[in-house]
Amino acid sequence: MKWKYTDYRPEGFECWSAKWKEDYELTVYQIGENRYSIGWYHKGCRVIKDYIDANSWDEAKTLAIARVKNYFHQMATYWDNMELGFIKWTREE
């Protein structure tokens, strides 16, 4: 099974990913009806793995960003001036 990028963004897909400054990536996976797993990676190594409850993908992405900001207070000023463009990943069998 492979993952591929698409920029089509309907609700209910399994993984969204956003890159920041080439070395960082934030992922949001839906693992249940209102349950999401988030990962924060630096150069491909996971720094944070956490779980959040949200009612929609938009809320999950907002909460994921807030969670990362909470872990890295020193990065908050960078995050406030950054736009994350989330990209949906879909599975290919």
Protein language model regions, located:
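Alpha-helical interaction segments
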Residues: 4-10, 26, 30-32, 61-62, ...
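Negatively charged, low-complexity tracts enriched in Asp/Glu with abundant Ser/Thr
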Residues: 1-21, 77, 81-90
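Mixed-charge, Lys/Arg-enriched low-complexity segments
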Residues: 42-93
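Short aromatic-glycine-(Arg/Gly/Cys) micro-motifs in beta-strand/loop hairpins
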Residues: 26-48
